[in-house]
Amino acid sequence: MKLVQMEQDSEALKEIDYNYNPFSVSEDQVTDNILAMFDSVGVLDALDIPADVIHAIVLDVKSQYTDVPFHNFNHVYTVLQMCYLILKGSTLVQKIVSTPVARFALLMSALCHDMNHPGNNNDFEIKSESELAILYNDISVLENLHCSSMFETLRRHNLHKFMDSNRGEWRDFRDIATTAILSTDMSQHKVLLQKVLGAVKDPGTLEVKDWVAYIVHTADLGNLTLEWDLALMWEDRIFKEFENQAEKEQKQGLEVATYMLNLDEVSRAKIQMGFIDYVLLPWWEAMNKLIPNDLEERLVCLKRSRENYTQVLSVLARKEQGGGAGGNEGPEA
């Protein structure tokens, strides 16, 4: 049975926007949205992938996400949704990420980029000398896990058989999707940023796989470009993961990163402001130049989040001094 196309008034696609909260709807609705996004960009028809096959793949992928606070299935849904909206909203991106294989790689790598995430970072895996760290030689440990999990799952569903081996479609898919997922390793962020800044001056230096990787990385760094209530929800979740990791490290006698300790409101706001100033703003400003103006609204929201944290710190400082919150001042919604 064929999925309903966007132009045929798909109910699932009507729900999709940047500030869509997957926690507010049923798991079935989230799955329907994912299937509709894959269908809407034309990859299922072009690659002759039956709806029941992609449905089975999505459910299999979903089963490999654990109930950790942040790196769960709803996180990757949010990343996938943002990648989809960037693709659908930018004529430039549509022209560059134009083939069915490239578009399929964009959406599938977004969906799979945190598969089997344990709820801690690479630093923990390396410090604890985990089996994963040994397997992947301390290099992009979790990203290699996510990537491997994706390909094992896709091969289990014989997805490679739907791609033309004579045209190298499966090989191209593997190249693009692998590049995208490995590029979500934050240790690669500074290198990626320099490449994006260089590409702003000369976009012709980029391959399709670079564009896909940058879009996925952008979406992965997108929480603070959402409405304030959603941004705070994701903030709570990432700091809960930090607390959980710090507790595990303390139990194992491992060194704990300072940003994972004593996470009171002031510390959290300062960490978030620093993350915006030194990571998010430079990246989003560069991407907004690479994809001219198509990310402007998200960039405005990011700057508003920065202003909101300034207000949060101001309110907390007045409370500390015994002056109360004062009036109706507070962060913008």
PLM region spans:
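Internal amphipathic alpha-helical repeat/solenoid segments
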Residues: 42-68, 88
